[in-house]
């Protein structure tokens, strides 16, 4: 069987590898190189659990990040070698409903 070598295309755009947490729902860790967690603090890795590869992504602005700001991700990767994306805060549907009907949600005011 003949071995084929595919040349790497050099690009000035930054790439990142995104991992999903095995312990925390909707928590993602962005690193610059696949399986390189050397810059991530040990305590964070312990709480994150076994990283599960989610995707590789160019950070050139062509694709939008869902719950993270592109510039913050790029800055964190450059400065600390990783970016941790936490889940959005849970929606308080009761509070939203009460404010939409004009009721004060503070227990002290009831």
UniProtKB/Swiss-Prot annotation:
Region (Disordered): 88-110
Annotated transmembrane regions: none
Database matches in HAMAP family: UPF0745
InterPro entries: YcgL-like_sf (IPR038068), YcgL_dom (IPR027354)
Residue ranges of every copy of the YcgL domain listed in the record: 14-98
Official protein name in the record: Protein YcgL
Gene name tied to this protein: ycgL
PROSITE patterns: YCGL (PS51648)
Biased composition range(s): Polar residues: 97-110
């Amino acid at each position: 069987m003949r071995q084929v070598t595919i040349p790497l295309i050099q690009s000035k755009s930054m790439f990142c590898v995104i991992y999903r947490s095995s312990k925390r729902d909707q928590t993602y860790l962005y690193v610059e190189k696949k399986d390189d967690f050397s810059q991530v603090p040990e305590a964070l890795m312990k709480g994150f659990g076994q990283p599960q590869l989610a995707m590789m992504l160019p950070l050139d602005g062509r694709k939008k990040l869902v719950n993270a700001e592109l510039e913050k991700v790029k800055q964190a990767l450059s400065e600390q070698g990783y970016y941790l994306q936490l889940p959005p805060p849970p929606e308080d549907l009761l509070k939203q409903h009460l404010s939409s009907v004009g009721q004060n949600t503070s227990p002290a005011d009831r």
